[in-house]
Amino acid sequence: MPSQRSPTKRSPTKRSPQKGAGKGGKGSKRGGKARRRGGAAVRRRRRRRESYGIYIYKVLKQVHPDTGISSRGMSIMNSFVNDVFERVAAEASRLTKYNRRSTVSSREIQTAVRLLLPGELAKHAVSEGTKAVTKYTTSR
């Protein structure tokens, strides 16, 4: 007797691959396996996501040792630091162009910080920056 399939069970059909589906695709989260010429499978290294997270955490522990931070809070702080960095870099670059120079120096960074940050905050930022540069130059 020929085997009959029950109407509830379906055989797998060939489907076209969906966009972003599968290993190693643009949308997949996990990296796929790369093949070498010999055929041995080798895992690809995942691209590292750069973040200021560890530095934000160190500063938090210096200021408030008993306080933690959520991943959402860390993400917001990371975005904030990136934003301030971009603003200072853009302003320092503009100042360098105005003065017809080709190198951004600590003087341009300091002036950019003074222009971007208000009053007392700018003074504290400049003093901390000067302290950090002095510490770096003496350690070299």
Curated annotation (Swiss-Prot):
What positions carry the motif SPKK motif 3? 16-19
Give the record's subunit note: The nucleosome is a histone octamer containing two molecules each of H2A, H2B, H3 and H4 assembled in one H3-H4 heterotetramer and two H2A-H2B heterodimers. The octamer wraps approximately 147 bp of DNA.
MF terms in GO:
DNA binding; protein heterodimerization activity; structural constituent of chromatin
Q: How is it modified after translation?
A: Monoubiquitination of Lys-135 gives a specific tag for epigenetic transcriptional activation and is also prerequisite for histone H3 'Lys-4' and 'Lys-79' methylation.
Can you say what this protein is called?
Answer: Histone H2B.1, sperm
Please provide, in alphabetical order, the Gene Ontology terms of the cellular component aspect for this entry. Answer: nucleosome; nucleus
- Species of origin reads Strongylocentrotus purpuratus (Purple sea urchin)
Q: Which residues carry this modification: Phosphoserine?
A: S11, S16
Q: According to its UniProt record, which protein family does this protein belong to?
A: Belongs to the histone H2B family.
Role according to the record:
Core component of nucleosome. Nucleosomes wrap and compact DNA into chromatin, limiting DNA accessibility to the cellular machineries which require DNA as a template. Histones thereby play a central role in transcription regulation, DNA repair, DNA replication and chromosomal stability. DNA accessibility is regulated via a complex set of post-translational modifications of histones, also called histone code, and nucleosome remodeling.
Q: Where in the cell is it found?
A: Nucleus; Chromosome
Q: Spell out where the chain is glycosylated.
A: S127
UniProt xrefs under InterPro entries:
Histone-fold, Histone_H2A/H2B/H3, Histone_H2B, HISTONE_H2B_site
Bias kind Basic residues: ranges: 7-17, 26-47
Q: Which SUPFAM superfamilies match?
A: Histone-fold
